[in-house]
A protein has these predicted regions:
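N-terminal export/targeting and maturation segments
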Residues: 16, 21-105
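N-terminal Sec-pathway targeting helices
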Residues: 1-24
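Generic low-complexity, intrinsically disordered sequence content enriched
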Residues: 5-7, 23, 36, 113, ...
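Extracytoplasmic electrostatic interaction patches
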Residues: 65-179
């Protein structure tokens, strides 16, 4: 009889610990994703712009509707600036087993970046061909255009200070991308 009571107490404690850990993990995950652009802005990265762009499209929420922008979060995550007709997307690469970023420009040029936002290839959809020499393209200028095209969302997200600051966890989780 005493043994059963001890076992019940132990099971209750284990359940409480599991619930507490699940709650902490859930709150932390929502905090990190919801404030990822803020954390990127305040990270020790030497290039916060690229990190902010990556976090914006990776962690966009369906409820993040803003005037002048439309969102797609089923499958590949995509943000469209409807006034400039440009798209920023994050999803599974068709050419390899990695994820990639894509910036689709209204002139028919599609820029594809790797998981660290380094330019991989350029596709001209009007001519149905890939550019062979991407070294002649000013990658920094393209990234600056992306930042400017999505600046209203980025600026708002940069200023959205989290309730609980988990900057150190963000820096640890994204340490490979913070350079």
């Amino acid at each position: 009889m005493v043994l059963r009571k001890e076992i019940r107490k132990m099971i209750k404690k284990i359940i409480m610990v599991i619930l507490a850990l699940a709650t902490i993990w859930f709150i932390g995950d929502i905090n990190l994703k919801g404030s990822s652009v803020y954390y990127a802005k305040h990270s020790p990265s030497s290039n916060t712009r690229d990190l902010e762009i990556m976090m914006l499209v990776e962690n966009i929420q369906a409820s993040a509707d803003r005037e002048g922008f439309s969102y797609e979060v089923d499958g590949d995550k995509t943000i469209q600036n409807t006034t400039k007709n440009v798209y920023l997307s994050y999803g599974h690469s068709v050419n390899d087993d990695n994820y990639e970023y894509a910036y689709m420009y209204e002139n028919g040029l599609d820029y594809y970046f790797d998981n660290f936002l380094k330019l991989k290839r350029i596709y001209n959809s009007k001519e149905a061909r890939y550019y062979k020499d991407i070294l002649t393209v000013d990658e920094n200028k393209i990234k600056e255009e992306i930042y400017e095209d999505f600046k209203p969302i980025l600026k708002e997200s940069e200023e959205n200070k989290p309730f609980i600051n988990l900057q150190w966890i963000f820096n640890w989780v994204y340490r490979d991308r913070i350079k």
